[in-house]
C-alpha cells in the first residue's frame, strides 16, 4: 500500500500539522490518526523533535480504538522509556488494560495513581468509564458523586451524572444535575431542552408547566431546535387536557400548542423535503391540530 505522503502528495510537516489539528479538535477519527501517525513515527521520528511524544500518545489511543494492540504497545513502550514513573503514561497503561477487558488490573492501577495524587481527575474519570463499561451504573453514580464533591465545577461530569440518573429512571436527581448545569450555562439550549424532557417525563401539572417553560427557553436560545418545538407542543397539549388545569391555563396552553404546531408545519414546508416526505410530515402536524380542536371543544 502506498504511503500517505505518496497517495496525497503531502510533506511530513503537513502530516504533523494535521495531527496537531486533530488533537486541538479532539477528533476521534482513529483510522486516519493511526495511518498518518504510524507513518510519522516510522519514517520521520528523528525530525519531529518533542512532538514525537504527544504523537505517540495520540497514535496509541487511536490504535486502542481500532484494535491494533501491537501498535498501541509499541507507542506505550516508547513513552515508558522516555517518561518512567509518569502518571500520564500509567493512565495510558490502564487504558490498554481496559481495551483488553482487564478491568480489575486497570482499576488497581488507577487506584495507585490516586493514592499518589488524589487530584488526578483523569484517573478518576477512567475508573468511572470502567464502571459504565461493566454495566455497574450504581457504582459509576457513586464514583461520580464522590468526584463532584471535590471538583464541583466539572460540567462534563454533571452532565454524565444526569445521563446515568436518566438511565436509572431517577428523574428527580437527573433534574438536579441539569439545574446545576443551567446555573453555570444559562445560554445552553441543549441543557434547557434536556431539563424540559426530564420534567415532561416526571409528569404532573407542575412538572408539565416547568417542561413547557424550558422547552420555550430552549427555543428562545435556538429557534432551530425542532426537538424543543415538538416538546413545547406536547407539554402545552398535555396541560390543556389536564383536568386539574384552570380554564385560563387550558386556554393559554391551547394557544401555545397551536402556535407550536403551526411552526412545525412551516418548518417542514421550508425544509425542502421531497413531496412524499412533506405530505407525511404535514399530515402529522394536521393530526396535532385536530387533537387541539378536540381538546378545545
From Swiss-Prot:
Any one Pfam family match given in the protein's UniProt record, by short name: TPR_EMC2
Record-level Gene Ontology MF annotations: membrane insertase activity
The entry's keywords: Acetylation, Endoplasmic reticulum, Membrane, Repeat, TPR repeat, Ubl conjugation
Entry-linked SMART domains: TPR
GO CC annotation terms, alphabetical: cytoplasm; EMC complex; endoplasmic reticulum; endoplasmic reticulum membrane; extrinsic component of endoplasmic reticulum membrane; mitochondrion
Entries under Gene3D superfamilies matching the protein: Tetratricopeptide repeat domain
Extent of the signal sequence: none
Membrane topology of this protein: Peripheral membrane protein
Locations listed in the record: Endoplasmic reticulum membrane
Residue numbers bearing the N6-acetyllysine modification: 255
In-chain residues carrying the UniProt-annotated modification N-acetylalanine: 2
Record PTM text: Ubiquitinated when soluble in the cytoplasm, leading to its degradation by the proteasome. Interaction with EMC2 prevents its ubiquitination and degradation.
InterPro entries: EMC2-like (IPR039856), TPR-like_helical_dom_sf (IPR011990), TPR_EMC2 (IPR055217), TPR_rpt (IPR019734)
UniProt TPR repeat ranges: 87-120, 155-188, 192-225
GO BP term, example: protein insertion into ER membrane by stop-transfer membrane-anchor sequence
Similarity annotation: Belongs to the EMC2 family.
Entry function: Part of the endoplasmic reticulum membrane protein complex (EMC) that enables the energy-independent insertion into endoplasmic reticulum membranes of newly synthesized membrane proteins. Preferentially accommodates proteins with transmembrane domains that are weakly hydrophobic or contain destabilizing features such as charged and aromatic residues. Involved in the cotranslational insertion of multi-pass membrane proteins in which stop-transfer membrane-anchor sequences become ER membrane spanning helices.
Matching PANTHER family: TETRATRICOPEPTIDE REPEAT PROTEIN
Subunit architecture: Component of the ER membrane protein complex (EMC). Interacts with WNK1 (via amphipathic alpha-helix region); promoting the ER membrane protein complex assembly by preventing EMC2 ubiquitination.
Designated name of the protein: ER membrane protein complex subunit 2
